[in-house]
């Protein structure tokens, strides 16, 4: 199902489109966004062995599997599901107050890094929150958050499944 000529051609075309200005060398195709996110989480957790927590943003949507429902900040999606994934939520970009929202995000991020040193397997970022109200974070805001996480050794994972194509250009 996942390994045929069409999928290979698609993956090669996607990498070619993504490569300018990036370090992308691999592509994984998935039949759904939730399964893509599950695999992304698995890769991050394997990369950061022993880091049981992850960082995500308020009002994010990850998918409808058991794990992605726990990460997503959609309360109804977690009803009746035992919580086994440790998620620390950060405030997302606010268009009406970019600088203030960045300060609030960075303050809480620093608190989590202090409180749970070396315990975050990744930070999951939707550059354009779909379920959260179609809120598009500014590139500069994303850059500051991502750079701080990279400084702390935390992989930065962009979940661009639902909002793909809503940015001005590919992988902006």
Placement of each model-derived feature along the sequence:
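Conserved PLP phosphate-binding loop immediately N-terminal to the Schiff-base lysine helix
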Residues: 126-139, 154-172
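A glycine-/small-polar-enriched, mobile loop at the entrance of the PLP active site in fold-type I
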Residues: 1-8, 129
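Short, cationic motifs built from Arg/Lys/His that form the positively charged side of catalytic pockets
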Residues: 45, 146, 167-168
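Loop/turn-to-beta-strand initiation segments
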Residues: 120, 153-154
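PLP-dependent aspartate aminotransferase-fold enzymes
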Residues: 11-122
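Surface-exposed amphipathic alpha-helices with a cationic face
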Residues: 15, 142-150
């Amino acid at each position: 199902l996942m390994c045929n000529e069409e999928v290979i051609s698609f993956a090669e075309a996607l990498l070619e489109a993504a490569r300018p200005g990036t370090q992308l060398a691999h592509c994984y195709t998935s039949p759904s966004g939730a399964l893509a996110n599950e695999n992304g989480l698995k890769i991050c957790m394997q990369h950061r062995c022993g880091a049981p927590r992850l960082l995500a943003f308020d009002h994010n949507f990850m998918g409808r599997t058991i794990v992605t429902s726990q990460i997503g900040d959609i309360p109804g999606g977690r009803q009746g599901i035992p919580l086994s994934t440790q998620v620390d939520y950060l405030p997302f970009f606010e268009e009406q107050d970019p600088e203030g929202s960045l300060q609030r995000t960075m303050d809480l991020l620093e608190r989590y890094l202090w409180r749970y040193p070396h315990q975050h397997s990744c930070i999951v970022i939707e550059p354009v929150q779909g379920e959260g109200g179609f809120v598009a974070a500014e590139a500069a805001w994303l850059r500051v958050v991502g750079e701080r996480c990279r400084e702390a050794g935390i992989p930065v994972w962009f979940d661009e499944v639902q909002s793909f194509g809503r940015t001005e250009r590919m992988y902006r």
